[in-house]
Amino acid sequence: VADGTDLDLRTRTLRAVHTPGHTLGHLVYHDAASEIMFAGDHVLPHITPSIGFEPAGNRMALRDYLSSLARTLALPDARLLPAHGPVTGSTHERVNELLAHHDLRLAETHQAVLGGHATPFEVAKAIKWTRRQRLFDELDLFSQVMSVNETAAHLEVLLVRGQVTRETSPTGADLYQVPVSQP
């Protein structure tokens, strides 16, 4: 289904809205007349969706996701019908929470790089995770892998914004640092 396609389902019309980030081809379906958004994994009520976790990979998955969240805010507010979790009254309210979360995570990531943590793994270990503020070593293995992937995505956004630089080590690892001209 192409972005912007209206699907006439007799009793309602759903507009397909391309929202890459969780996956490259993710779509939400907005029913403006009924003020409902079928959000899939784009906006979840209690957790942040995993970003760019697919075999094809997308180095800029977080940038795409943040743009998709902004695009969601540009639509009229609607009840949120997510793929996981309860229906909530406002898509916009949850989108604003997700944007605030990622702003905070970007700041924490930048601070960790400022503190000398250079690889996505090192940065992930320097940050607390989940709403319970758990240390990296307290996470199960799958969550650790997801945390390193999320950290790499945040580092890529900081790189595009000019807040960090990236070099490749002789072993092929990505090494990030804050530019000298930046505090």
Feature map (PLM): residue ranges:
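Conserved beta-strand positions that form and line the central face of beta-propeller blades
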Residues: 6, 18, 175
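A short catalytic or substrate-binding loop motif that flags glycine-/basic-rich loops and adjacent residues
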Residues: 1, 20-23, 170, 183
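Metallo-beta-lactamase
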Residues: 13-107
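Hydrophobic helix-cap positions at the C-terminus of alpha-helices
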Residues: 7, 72-75, 158
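Conserved hydrophobic "DFG−1" position in protein kinase catalytic cores
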Residues: 8-9, 29-31, 166, 178
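Alpha-helix-centered segments that form part of catalytic cores
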Residues: 1-10
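Active-site/binding-pocket entry motifs
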Residues: 7, 44-45, 86-87, 129-133
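C-terminal regulatory/interaction regions
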Residues: 111-183
